[in-house]
């Protein structure tokens, strides 16, 4: 007897190919829908953030009606009398201080909230300041734990743009020596997305000043460094933000030097350990790096016109 004939198999390549095409079409369709929903959500969040900021600006920038304030006549000061005891013997020369001492707000010894901030803090008591860079930023600054405002606007409503916030470790009971502000690097330019403009030398020369007013005092700052730094210890770009905020003069001096060495600009604006620093920090494409725009408070014996001329004349990339 001969072997039984094998049943010939029939392969339906065409049907399988059609199923594959249908599956790919479904996958691409789902991706398109999800992407569209995200884009719409981002657009809505951006619009809501802009509207919320605009309404708060109206409150913050509204002109205050002049009020009559009572004039306090200072009590007469009794001049010191000469000491009747023999002067103490001369001791060894005092060593220079190694730590910065707390400083009260000039003219606001008890840290009273200004009337301008009393108005905006009715919207949210977390509002502690207002940041202004002409033509770029005009936003409220809030403070709570560092996670809270990453995805919430200044009102506490969910928003992918987040809010500009002051580092949680910054104590405003006295004037801080370092103010660390964080904000998202939004592609729309919202929050700290516009800080990328400072990588253009011409822009920096034309916009070297920042206004940051807190609830307790106004502040005007001059930019001395623009850098992309690393948060990874051991990297040549590493800058320790903790040391920049340290009251230890040596630590602070070393951290300022490290920041200056990583700046893309070389400028003649000097920085001292006892200067009040303002650091605007945002993320970049690398998760372990940050863009930093660093400024110091303008000193009492300085004027903006002279500083601006100095920056335009001496700053190089």
Positions of predicted regions on the chain:
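N-terminal Lys/Arg-rich, disordered targeting/topogenic segments
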Residues: 1-19
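Alpha-helical transmembrane segments
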Residues: 19-33
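Solvent-exposed, non-transmembrane regions of membrane-associated and secreted proteins
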Residues: 31-317
């Amino acid at each position: 007897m001969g072997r039984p004939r094998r049943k010939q198999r029939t392969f339906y390549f065409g049907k399988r190919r059609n199923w594959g095409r249908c599956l790919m079409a479904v996958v691409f369709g789902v991706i398109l829908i999800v992407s569209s929903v995200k884009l719409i959500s981002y657009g809505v969040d951006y619009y809501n953030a802009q509207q919320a900021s605009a309404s708060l600006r109206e409150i913050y920038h509204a002109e205050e009606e002049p009020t009559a304030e009572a004039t306090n006549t200072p009590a007469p000061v009794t001049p010191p009398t000469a000491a009747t005891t023999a002067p103490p013997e001369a001791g060894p020369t005092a060593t220079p201080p190694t730590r910065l001492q707390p400083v009260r707000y000039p003219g606001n010894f008890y840290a009273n909230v200004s009337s301008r901030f009393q108005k905006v803090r009715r919207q949210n008591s977390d509002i502690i300041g207002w940041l202004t860079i002409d033509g770029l930023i005009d936003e409220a600054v809030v403070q709570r734990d560092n996670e809270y405002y990453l995805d919430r606007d200044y009102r506490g409503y969910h928003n992918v743009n987040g809010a500009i916030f002051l580092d949680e470790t910054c104590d405003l009971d006295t004037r801080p020596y370092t103010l660390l502000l964080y904000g998202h690097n939004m592609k729309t330019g919202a929050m700290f997305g516009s800080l990328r403009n400072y990588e253009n030398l011409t822009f920096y020369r034309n916009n070297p000043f920042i206004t940051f007013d807190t609830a307790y005092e106004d502040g005007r700052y001059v930019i001395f460094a623009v850098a992309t730094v690393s948060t990874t210890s051991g990297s040549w770009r590493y800058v320790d933000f903790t040391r920049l905020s340290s009251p230890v003069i040596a630590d602070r001096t070393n951290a300022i030097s490290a920041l200056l060495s990583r700046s893309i600009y070389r400028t003649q604006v000097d920085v001292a350990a006892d200067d009040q620093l303002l650091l605007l920090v945002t993320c970049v494409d690398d998760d372990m790096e940050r863009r930093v725009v660093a400024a110091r408070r303008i000193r009492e014996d300085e004027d903006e016109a002279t500083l601006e001329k100095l920056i335009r004349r001496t700053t190089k990339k």
